[in-house]
Protein backbone atom coordinates (compact mmCIF):
# COMPACT_ATOMS: atom_id res chain seq x y z
CA UNK A 1 0.00 0.00 0.00
CA UNK A 2 1.35 3.40 -0.99
CA UNK A 3 1.87 5.98 1.74
CA UNK A 4 0.70 9.57 1.35
CA UNK A 5 3.58 12.04 1.18
CA UNK A 6 2.30 15.51 1.98
CA UNK A 7 0.96 17.76 4.71
CA UNK A 8 -0.23 16.15 7.95
CA UNK A 9 -3.66 17.80 7.60
CA UNK A 10 -4.21 15.99 4.28
CA UNK A 11 -2.98 12.60 5.53
CA UNK A 12 -6.19 11.85 7.46
CA UNK A 13 -8.35 12.78 4.50
CA UNK A 14 -6.28 10.54 2.24
CA UNK A 15 -6.66 7.62 4.69
CA UNK A 16 -10.45 8.06 4.79
CA UNK A 17 -10.63 8.04 1.01
CA UNK A 18 -8.56 4.85 0.89
CA UNK A 19 -10.92 3.14 3.39
CA UNK A 20 -13.99 4.18 1.39
CA UNK A 21 -12.38 2.84 -1.74
CA UNK A 22 -11.65 -0.53 -0.07
CA UNK A 23 -15.26 -0.80 1.16
CA UNK A 24 -16.60 -0.01 -2.31
CA UNK A 25 -14.27 -2.62 -3.80
CA UNK A 26 -15.54 -5.26 -1.34
CA UNK A 27 -19.16 -4.43 -2.18
CA UNK A 28 -18.44 -4.75 -5.90
CA UNK A 29 -16.78 -8.16 -5.38
CA UNK A 30 -19.75 -9.35 -3.27
CA UNK A 31 -22.28 -8.30 -5.91
CA UNK A 32 -20.21 -9.90 -8.62
CA UNK A 33 -20.13 -13.27 -6.80
CA UNK A 34 -23.87 -13.10 -6.14
CA UNK A 35 -24.63 -12.49 -9.83
CA UNK A 36 -22.33 -15.34 -10.84
CA UNK A 37 -24.12 -17.71 -8.45
CA UNK A 38 -27.53 -16.69 -9.79
CA UNK A 39 -26.49 -17.05 -13.42
CA UNK A 40 -24.46 -20.22 -12.89
CA UNK A 41 -25.50 -22.92 -15.34
CA UNK A 42 -26.37 -26.27 -13.88
CA UNK A 43 -25.49 -29.57 -15.46
CA UNK A 44 -27.55 -30.67 -18.41
CA UNK A 45 -29.01 -33.66 -16.43
CA UNK A 46 -30.28 -31.47 -13.56
CA UNK A 47 -31.64 -28.84 -15.92
CA UNK A 48 -33.87 -31.18 -17.84
CA UNK A 49 -34.54 -33.70 -15.05
CA UNK A 50 -38.08 -32.57 -14.16
CA UNK A 51 -39.01 -32.17 -17.82
CA UNK A 52 -37.75 -35.69 -18.62
CA UNK A 53 -39.53 -37.29 -15.64
CA UNK A 54 -42.87 -35.72 -16.62
CA UNK A 55 -42.51 -36.97 -20.21
CA UNK A 56 -41.64 -40.53 -19.05
CA UNK A 57 -44.58 -40.63 -16.66
CA UNK A 58 -47.03 -39.49 -19.35
CA UNK A 59 -45.53 -42.01 -21.82
CA UNK A 60 -46.03 -44.88 -19.36
CA UNK A 61 -49.64 -44.00 -18.62
CA UNK A 62 -50.59 -43.54 -22.28
CA UNK A 63 -48.90 -46.75 -23.54
CA UNK A 64 -50.94 -49.97 -23.18
CA UNK A 65 -49.71 -53.33 -24.34
CA UNK A 66 -46.92 -54.06 -26.76
CA UNK A 67 -45.98 -51.40 -29.33
CA UNK A 68 -43.29 -51.16 -31.97
CA UNK A 69 -40.20 -49.02 -31.56
CA UNK A 70 -41.36 -46.56 -34.22
CA UNK A 71 -44.74 -46.13 -32.52
CA UNK A 72 -42.96 -45.62 -29.21
CA UNK A 73 -40.68 -42.93 -30.67
CA UNK A 74 -43.59 -41.16 -32.42
CA UNK A 75 -45.67 -41.17 -29.22
CA UNK A 76 -42.66 -39.88 -27.26
CA UNK A 77 -42.16 -36.99 -29.74
CA UNK A 78 -45.85 -36.06 -29.51
CA UNK A 79 -45.71 -36.01 -25.72
CA UNK A 80 -42.52 -33.84 -25.79
CA UNK A 81 -44.15 -31.34 -28.19
CA UNK A 82 -47.29 -31.14 -26.02
CA UNK A 83 -45.14 -30.66 -22.93
CA UNK A 84 -43.18 -27.85 -24.61
CA UNK A 85 -46.41 -26.16 -25.72
CA UNK A 86 -47.78 -26.29 -22.17
CA UNK A 87 -44.55 -24.85 -20.76
CA UNK A 88 -44.59 -22.06 -23.37
CA UNK A 89 -48.24 -21.27 -22.55
CA UNK A 90 -47.46 -21.14 -18.84
CA UNK A 91 -44.55 -18.79 -19.51
CA UNK A 92 -46.72 -16.52 -21.67
CA UNK A 93 -49.40 -16.45 -18.97
CA UNK A 94 -46.81 -15.48 -16.37
CA UNK A 95 -45.48 -12.69 -18.63
CA UNK A 96 -49.00 -11.39 -19.25
CA UNK A 97 -49.75 -11.44 -15.52
CA UNK A 98 -46.57 -9.46 -14.84
CA UNK A 99 -47.50 -6.95 -17.58
CA UNK A 100 -51.02 -6.57 -16.17
CA UNK A 101 -49.62 -6.05 -12.68
CA UNK A 102 -47.22 -3.37 -13.96
CA UNK A 103 -50.04 -1.64 -15.86
CA UNK A 104 -52.24 -1.71 -12.76
CA UNK A 105 -49.46 -0.18 -10.65
CA UNK A 106 -48.84 2.53 -13.28
CA UNK A 107 -52.59 3.28 -13.51
CA UNK A 108 -52.77 3.60 -9.74
CA UNK A 109 -49.84 6.01 -9.77
CA UNK A 110 -51.43 8.10 -12.53
CA UNK A 111 -54.73 8.18 -10.63
CA UNK A 112 -52.98 9.40 -7.49
CA UNK A 113 -51.18 12.11 -9.49
CA UNK A 114 -54.45 13.33 -11.01
CA UNK A 115 -56.09 13.43 -7.58
CA UNK A 116 -53.18 15.44 -6.16
CA UNK A 117 -53.29 17.90 -9.07
CA UNK A 118 -57.08 18.31 -8.79
CA UNK A 119 -56.77 18.89 -5.06
CA UNK A 120 -54.09 21.57 -5.56
CA UNK A 121 -56.25 23.37 -8.16
CA UNK A 122 -59.31 23.29 -5.87
CA UNK A 123 -57.33 24.76 -3.00
CA UNK A 124 -56.02 27.52 -5.27
CA UNK A 125 -59.54 28.28 -6.54
CA UNK A 126 -60.87 28.48 -3.00
CA UNK A 127 -58.07 30.87 -2.03
CA UNK A 128 -58.77 32.99 -5.09
CA UNK A 129 -62.49 33.07 -4.31
CA UNK A 130 -61.80 34.14 -0.73
CA UNK A 131 -59.37 36.81 -1.93
CA UNK A 132 -61.85 38.03 -4.56
CA UNK A 133 -64.58 38.31 -1.92
CA UNK A 134 -62.28 40.26 0.38
CA UNK A 135 -61.19 42.49 -2.50
CA UNK A 136 -64.81 43.21 -3.49
CA UNK A 137 -65.64 44.11 0.08
CA UNK A 138 -62.60 46.38 0.37
CA UNK A 139 -63.28 48.00 -3.01
CA UNK A 140 -66.85 48.82 -2.05
CA UNK A 141 -65.56 50.52 1.09
CA UNK A 142 -62.86 52.37 -0.85
CA UNK A 143 -65.25 53.60 -3.52
CA UNK A 144 -67.29 55.45 -0.94
CA UNK A 145 -64.13 57.00 0.52
CA UNK A 146 -62.56 57.84 -2.87
CA UNK A 147 -65.54 59.66 -4.40
CA UNK A 148 -64.52 63.12 -3.06
CA UNK A 149 -60.86 62.32 -3.87
CA UNK A 150 -61.76 61.41 -7.45
CA UNK A 151 -63.48 64.75 -7.95
CA UNK A 152 -60.39 66.58 -6.75
CA UNK A 153 -58.15 64.44 -8.99
CA UNK A 154 -60.18 65.26 -12.10
CA UNK A 155 -59.87 68.96 -11.33
CA UNK A 156 -56.07 68.61 -10.92
CA UNK A 157 -55.78 66.72 -14.22
CA UNK A 158 -57.55 69.55 -16.03
CA UNK A 159 -55.05 72.04 -14.63
CA UNK A 160 -51.94 69.93 -15.39
CA UNK A 161 -50.35 70.56 -18.80
CA UNK A 162 -48.99 67.33 -20.37
CA UNK A 163 -45.19 67.35 -20.75
CA UNK A 164 -43.91 66.09 -24.10
CA UNK A 165 -40.90 63.79 -24.06
CA UNK A 166 -37.92 65.06 -26.02
CA UNK A 167 -36.79 62.89 -28.90
CA UNK A 168 -33.09 62.18 -29.29
CA UNK A 169 -32.05 63.73 -32.59
CA UNK A 170 -28.84 63.19 -34.54
CA UNK A 171 -26.69 66.07 -35.71
CA UNK A 172 -26.09 65.72 -39.48
CA UNK A 173 -23.08 68.08 -39.32
CA UNK A 174 -20.99 65.76 -37.13
CA UNK A 175 -17.94 64.22 -38.85
CA UNK A 176 -18.42 60.44 -38.95
CA UNK A 177 -15.55 59.62 -41.28
CA UNK A 178 -13.59 58.01 -38.42
CA UNK A 179 -16.34 55.43 -37.89
CA UNK A 180 -15.99 52.06 -39.65
CA UNK A 181 -17.96 51.89 -42.89
CA UNK A 182 -17.87 48.73 -45.01
CA UNK A 183 -19.02 50.42 -48.21
CA UNK A 184 -16.46 53.20 -47.87
CA UNK A 185 -13.68 50.70 -47.16
CA UNK A 186 -14.63 48.60 -50.19
CA UNK A 187 -14.68 51.73 -52.36
CA UNK A 188 -11.23 52.75 -51.08
CA UNK A 189 -9.89 49.25 -51.73
CA UNK A 190 -11.24 49.32 -55.29
CA UNK A 191 -9.65 52.75 -55.83
CA UNK A 192 -6.31 51.51 -54.47
CA UNK A 193 -6.41 48.46 -56.74
CA UNK A 194 -7.23 50.65 -59.77
CA UNK A 195 -4.36 53.03 -58.98
CA UNK A 196 -2.00 50.10 -58.43
CA UNK A 197 -2.85 48.59 -61.80
CA UNK A 198 -2.42 51.99 -63.49
CA UNK A 199 0.97 52.42 -61.83
CA UNK A 200 2.07 48.92 -62.89
CA UNK A 201 1.04 49.64 -66.48
CA UNK A 202 2.90 52.98 -66.47
CA UNK A 203 6.06 51.34 -65.13
CA UNK A 204 5.80 48.56 -67.73
CA UNK A 205 5.52 51.17 -70.48
CA UNK A 206 8.48 53.08 -69.02
CA UNK A 207 10.63 49.92 -68.91
CA UNK A 208 9.79 49.21 -72.55
CA UNK A 209 11.02 52.63 -73.73
CA UNK A 210 14.22 52.76 -75.80
CA UNK A 211 17.31 54.52 -74.50
CA UNK A 212 20.55 55.42 -76.26
CA UNK A 213 23.61 54.73 -74.11
CA UNK A 214 27.03 56.17 -74.91
CA UNK A 215 29.85 54.19 -73.31
CA UNK A 216 33.62 54.06 -73.55
CA UNK A 217 35.59 50.83 -73.68
CA UNK A 218 38.47 51.55 -71.30
CA UNK A 219 41.85 49.82 -71.64
CA UNK A 220 43.88 52.81 -70.47
CA UNK A 221 42.39 55.01 -73.17
CA UNK A 222 38.78 55.56 -74.17
CA UNK A 223 37.02 54.09 -77.22
CA UNK A 224 33.53 55.56 -77.40
CA UNK A 225 30.62 53.60 -78.80
CA UNK A 226 26.83 53.88 -78.74
CA UNK A 227 24.24 51.16 -78.18
CA UNK A 228 20.43 51.06 -78.06
CA UNK A 229 18.82 49.40 -75.02
CA UNK A 230 15.51 49.26 -73.15
CA UNK A 231 15.17 51.09 -69.85
CA UNK A 232 14.15 47.82 -68.21
CA UNK A 233 17.36 46.01 -69.30
CA UNK A 234 19.93 45.11 -66.66
CA UNK A 235 23.60 46.07 -66.58
CA UNK A 236 24.47 42.44 -67.41
CA UNK A 237 22.34 42.56 -70.59
CA UNK A 238 23.99 45.87 -71.48
CA UNK A 239 27.48 44.34 -71.12
CA UNK A 240 26.48 41.41 -73.34
CA UNK A 241 25.38 43.87 -76.02
CA UNK A 242 28.66 45.77 -75.64
CA UNK A 243 30.66 42.55 -76.09
CA UNK A 244 28.84 41.76 -79.33
CA UNK A 245 29.82 45.22 -80.60
CA UNK A 246 33.46 45.27 -79.37
CA UNK A 247 34.59 41.72 -80.19
CA UNK A 248 34.97 42.65 -83.84
CA UNK A 249 37.59 45.32 -83.05
CA UNK A 250 39.39 44.13 -79.88
CA UNK A 251 41.09 40.74 -79.91
CA UNK A 252 41.33 40.45 -76.10
CA UNK A 253 37.51 40.41 -75.85
CA UNK A 254 36.92 37.39 -78.13
CA UNK A 255 37.09 34.86 -75.28
CA UNK A 256 35.63 37.11 -72.59
CA UNK A 257 32.16 36.72 -71.06
CA UNK A 258 29.94 39.47 -69.67
CA UNK A 259 30.70 38.32 -66.10
CA UNK A 260 34.34 39.40 -66.61
CA UNK A 261 33.39 42.98 -67.53
CA UNK A 262 32.65 45.99 -65.31
CA UNK A 263 30.53 49.07 -65.93
CA UNK A 264 31.74 52.22 -64.18
CA UNK A 265 29.45 55.25 -64.26
CA UNK A 266 30.31 58.54 -62.50
CA UNK A 267 33.17 56.82 -60.60
CA UNK A 268 30.83 54.12 -59.23
CA UNK A 269 31.04 50.41 -60.09
CA UNK A 270 27.46 49.39 -60.89
CA UNK A 271 26.42 45.81 -59.99
CA UNK A 272 25.20 43.61 -62.85
CA UNK A 273 21.75 42.92 -61.35
CA UNK A 274 20.67 46.57 -61.40
CA UNK A 275 18.66 47.91 -64.35
CA UNK A 276 18.70 51.36 -65.96
CA UNK A 277 15.11 51.72 -64.78
CA UNK A 278 16.29 51.54 -61.14
CA UNK A 279 18.60 54.54 -61.55
CA UNK A 280 16.11 56.55 -63.63
CA UNK A 281 13.20 56.15 -61.19
CA UNK A 282 15.27 56.89 -58.06
CA UNK A 283 17.19 59.77 -59.70
CA UNK A 284 20.38 58.17 -58.42
CA UNK A 285 23.56 60.22 -58.32
CA UNK A 286 27.22 59.30 -58.48
CA UNK A 287 30.43 60.94 -57.31
CA UNK A 288 30.91 63.03 -60.46
CA UNK A 289 27.42 63.28 -61.97
CA UNK A 290 23.90 61.84 -62.19
CA UNK A 291 23.38 58.13 -62.89
CA UNK A 292 19.99 58.60 -64.56
CA UNK A 293 21.34 60.33 -67.69
CA UNK A 294 23.27 58.36 -70.29
CA UNK A 295 24.16 61.00 -72.90
CA UNK A 296 27.63 62.60 -73.01
CA UNK A 297 28.93 65.89 -71.65
CA UNK A 298 32.47 66.86 -70.72
CA UNK A 299 31.51 68.58 -67.46
CA UNK A 300 28.35 68.48 -65.44
CA UNK A 301 28.59 72.14 -64.37
CA UNK A 302 28.03 75.18 -66.50
CA UNK A 303 31.01 77.49 -66.96
CA UNK A 304 29.06 80.65 -66.18
CA UNK A 305 27.31 79.39 -63.03
CA UNK A 306 28.89 76.52 -61.15
CA UNK A 307 26.01 76.31 -58.66
CA UNK A 308 23.50 75.26 -61.35
CA UNK A 309 23.62 71.53 -62.02
CA UNK A 310 23.09 70.21 -65.51
CA UNK A 311 21.50 66.79 -66.02
CA UNK A 312 24.10 65.75 -68.59
CA UNK A 313 26.70 63.21 -67.52
CA UNK A 314 29.93 61.49 -68.53
CA UNK A 315 30.13 58.40 -70.70
CA UNK A 316 30.25 55.23 -68.62
CA UNK A 317 33.33 53.04 -68.84
CA UNK A 318 33.19 49.37 -69.86
CA UNK A 319 36.39 47.54 -68.90
CA UNK A 320 37.84 44.17 -68.02
CA UNK A 321 37.80 43.23 -64.34
CA UNK A 322 41.40 42.00 -64.69
CA UNK A 323 42.51 45.45 -65.91
CA UNK A 324 40.86 47.06 -62.86
CA UNK A 325 42.61 44.65 -60.47
CA UNK A 326 45.99 45.56 -62.01
CA UNK A 327 45.42 49.33 -62.06
CA UNK A 328 43.07 50.09 -59.16
CA UNK A 329 45.85 52.00 -57.34
CA UNK A 330 46.26 54.42 -60.29
CA UNK A 331 43.99 57.35 -61.18
CA UNK A 332 41.20 57.24 -62.34
CA UNK A 333 40.63 53.66 -61.09
CA UNK A 334 41.71 54.72 -57.60
CA UNK A 335 38.55 56.88 -57.35
CA UNK A 336 36.15 54.10 -58.26
CA UNK A 337 34.11 52.37 -55.58
CA UNK A 338 31.13 49.96 -55.55
CA UNK A 339 27.68 51.54 -55.79
CA UNK A 340 25.88 51.87 -52.44
CA UNK A 341 22.20 52.94 -52.72
CA UNK A 342 22.16 54.08 -49.07
CA UNK A 343 25.05 56.48 -49.55
CA UNK A 344 24.41 60.08 -50.64
CA UNK A 345 26.67 61.89 -53.16
CA UNK A 346 25.53 65.51 -52.88
CA UNK A 347 28.81 67.16 -53.94
CA UNK A 348 30.35 66.20 -57.26
CA UNK A 349 34.13 65.99 -57.62
CA UNK A 350 36.29 65.19 -60.64
CA UNK A 351 39.77 65.55 -59.12
CA UNK A 352 42.07 62.96 -57.57
CA UNK A 353 42.21 63.74 -53.84
CA UNK A 354 45.23 61.47 -53.30
CA UNK A 355 47.19 63.37 -55.94
CA UNK A 356 46.22 66.70 -54.35
CA UNK A 357 47.57 65.55 -50.97
CA UNK A 358 50.93 64.68 -52.54
Swiss-Prot record:
Any one of the GO CC terms: nucleus
Transmembrane domains' residue ranges: none
GO BP annotation list: chromatin organization
Comp. bias intervals (Acidic residues): 124-144
Pfam families for the chain: XAP5
Region (Disordered): 122-152
Family label: Belongs to the FAM50 family.
Protein name as catalogued: Protein FAM50 homolog
Organism from which the protein derives: Drosophila pseudoobscura pseudoobscura
Amino acid sequence: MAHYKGAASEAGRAAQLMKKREIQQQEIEFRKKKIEEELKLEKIENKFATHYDAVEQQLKTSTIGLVTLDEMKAKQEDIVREREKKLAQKKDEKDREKQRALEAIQAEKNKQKRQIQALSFNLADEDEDDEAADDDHQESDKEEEDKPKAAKWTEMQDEIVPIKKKKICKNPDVDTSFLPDREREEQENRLRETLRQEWVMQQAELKDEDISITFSYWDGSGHRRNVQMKKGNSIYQFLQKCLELLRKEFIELKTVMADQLMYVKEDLILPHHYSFYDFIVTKARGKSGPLFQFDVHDDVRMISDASVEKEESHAGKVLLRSWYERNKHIFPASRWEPYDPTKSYDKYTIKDKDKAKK
